[in-house]
Amino acid sequence: MIEEKKELKKRRVLQMARFYGAAAFTLITMRLISRAIKVRKYVPSIFQQNYKLPPFSQRNEAMSALTYASAASIGTFSTLIFGFCWALDISTAREFVFKTREFMSLPQALETDTSMDEETSKLTKQLQDLLSSENNK
């Protein structure tokens, strides 16, 4: 009983750490995005034209925007997922499947159909052979 409580506490602390880590990543990313937007803002001085754009590289701007957008979406969705898992006490993907099936009122299947077609089994065997030959070197 005491061991179960310790295990549950350790599990909840791990879930909390994941959530707060994802939230911190999201906040840092959003702060970087805000700073990047402020830097790019063009404020002309008294004798400069209002419509003159500062020189910039389109490739660098596109890469920067893609990086910031990707980091923001990854951070937001990871915070959402880890918060959901923390609230519902989910630690593994298998638990997530069971809770989702329970939520959608689907029958629980302990054994899933893991049969493969012929092409998939050949590909799996080739990959396993390749990985085992790399490990032997």
Curated annotation (Swiss-Prot):
It is found in: Membrane. GO terms for cellular component: membrane; mitochondrion; peroxisome. It is a multi-pass membrane protein. Disruption phenotype: Increases frequency of mitochondrial genome loss and leads to synthetic letality with a prohibitin complex subunit PHB1 deletant. Its main location: membrane. It comes from the Eukaryota. The chain crosses the membrane at residues 20-37, 66-88. The keyword Transmembrane helix applies. Keywords: Membrane, Transmembrane, Transmembrane helix. The keyword Transmembrane helix applies. Present with 1835 molecules/cell in log phase SD medium. Belongs to the AIM11 family. This is Altered inheritance of mitochondria protein 11. It comes from Saccharomyces cerevisiae (strain ATCC 204508 / S288c). The gene is AIM11.
